[in-house]
């Protein structure tokens, strides 16, 4: 399987939640870039989770940092913000199949 990739997380309370699986050697770099883009990382020692909460997104992972869960807090997240986060992950949208001509 090629990294990065994502899977929809239907068990989360927020409707648009995805788990992003990234290359382990990029995890620290990705979290530094997320912190620069979205705000400070909070470490929750009691549950071994690190999290960034912004006005529109929550980004969360265990202390090893991978996979990264991305939750949209609001249904109308700016597509440019999602594009910047996807660029940090190195993620591109899954290709869609075009109907034959």
Predicted feature descriptions by range:
Residues 1-101:
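Structured alpha/beta or helical-core interaction and ligand-binding surfaces enriched in interleaved
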């Amino acid at each position: 399987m090629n990294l990065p990739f994502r899977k929809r997380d239907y068990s989360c309370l927020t409707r648009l939640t995805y788990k992003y699986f990234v290359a382990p050697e990029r995890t620290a770099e990705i979290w530094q870039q997320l912190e620069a883009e979205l705000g400070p990382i909070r470490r929750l020692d009691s549950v071994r989770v690190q999290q960034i909460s912004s006005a529109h997104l929550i980004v969360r992972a265990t202390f090893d940092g991978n996979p990264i869960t991305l939750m949209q807090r609001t249904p109308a997240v700016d597509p440019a913000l999602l594009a910047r986060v996807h660029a940090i992950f190195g993620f591109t949208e899954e290709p869609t199949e075009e109907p034959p001509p």
